[in-house]
Amino acid sequence: MSGYADTSFLVSLYVLDGNSARAAAEMKHAKLPILLTPFGELELTNAMLLRLFRRELSASRVKAAQALVRKDIEDGIFLLRPLAGSVYERAKQIARRRTPRLGSRTLDVLHVASALVLQADTFYTFDRSQAKLAKAEGLTVP
């Protein structure tokens, strides 16, 4: 049993927002480590830098948040796992099955496929449409 966190959840862990308290509470009950892919790490980095561009975060705050992410990976809170090539075939299968009814976005499909290929059973997200997709694919969304 393991969990997978998408970017909406990860950003809320490292950048104060309306979901930060909920993210922290979920982490207290989560079975560690939480799975993270290089794709997820990239998306998290870009989300923080986008907030810098929009002047929602200072450069020093982004640097501090990125240092916390690295520390949490080093401390084993998150386990960085590479994406196998099979994730893309799984994502195509999910897209064919779910997108016509749910209107799923490509990166949402890729996150859910990643969680499934990595054998996660719990999916942490604050994105409602992604949560619907994850639940439809049998993942538990707290």
Language model segments and positions:
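Short glycine-enriched loop/turn motifs at secondary-structure junctions
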Residues: 27-29, 73-75, 117-118
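Short, well-structured N-terminal submotif of metal-dependent ribonuclease cores
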Residues: 1-43, 47, 51-64, 137-140
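A general structural signal for well-ordered secondary-structure junctions
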Residues: 20, 32-33, 75-79, 101, ...
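Active-site neighborhoods of divalent-metal-dependent phosphate/nucleic-acid chemistry enzymes
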Residues: 77-132
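Short acidic/polar alpha-helix capping motifs at helix-coil junctions
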Residues: 12-14, 34-39, 74-79, 93-98
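Active-site-proximal, substrate-binding regions of enzyme catalytic domains
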Residues: 45-96, 136
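A generic local structural motif
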Residues: 20-22, 67, 109-112
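Conserved beta-strand termini and adjacent loop/short-helix elements that scaffold enzyme active sites
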Residues: 37, 81-83, 142
